[in-house]
């Protein structure tokens, strides 16, 4: 009971305090840039390494492939390049950051670096060959958090997941348009057969 109380009270309260502190201090930094006249010559990028559960699905923390954890904050303020209030729905990844920072700074991007620069996307010119799926794999089990090993792939509209522990062999498929909170798996339903087969093919490709 004490652990449960800590997880759902102290831990989440600490997390929310952290968010409030970050918000306050990002604001202070933006105010400083404005006051010193540096705003027009500074690119501000805010991101995180993962999302977080605040009770969704009955969970806290991260790790699972569901949307609340899989999606991460990524905000960019680049005067004369990004338009305030615009949203880009392309699939990006932290592996793209290094290439992006190098290009923004005017440095050469090595040919063998992982990821691709996000600069074209920030300018509103998404390359035709930009990725259309995202692969995720969680393998840290057993552990105190008791999150089972699983992997999956999403194209932004649909998400296919497989839990593969020796005592678990389960698949889940979600239609994120009709079920954005991922409450009802549609895996095995005939109307999703082609979607399911296509995502399995893509999952196998990504895992090679």
Identify the meaning behind each predicted range.
Residues 31-86, 93, 144:
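Histidine-centered active-site microenvironments of extracellular/periplasmic hydrolases
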Residues 16, 69, 88-91, 95, ...:
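Short, solvent-exposed loop/helix junctions and linker helices
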Residues 50-56, 95-98, 103-176, 181, ...:
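C-terminal cap/loop subdomain of S1 sulfatases and analogous C-terminal strand-loop tails that border
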Residues 2-42:
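A long, amphipathic alpha-helix that forms part
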Residues 1-10, 18, 22, 93, ...:
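Long, internal low-complexity/basic segments
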Residues 15, 19-22, 26, 43-48, ...:
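Beta-strand elements within well-structured catalytic alpha/beta cores of enzymes
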Residues 32, 36, 104-107, 124, ...:
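Generic structural signal for alpha-helix termini and adjacent loop/cap motifs
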Residues 82-87, 107-109, 190:
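Short, polar/flexible loop-turn hinges at active-site or ligand-entry regions and domain interfaces
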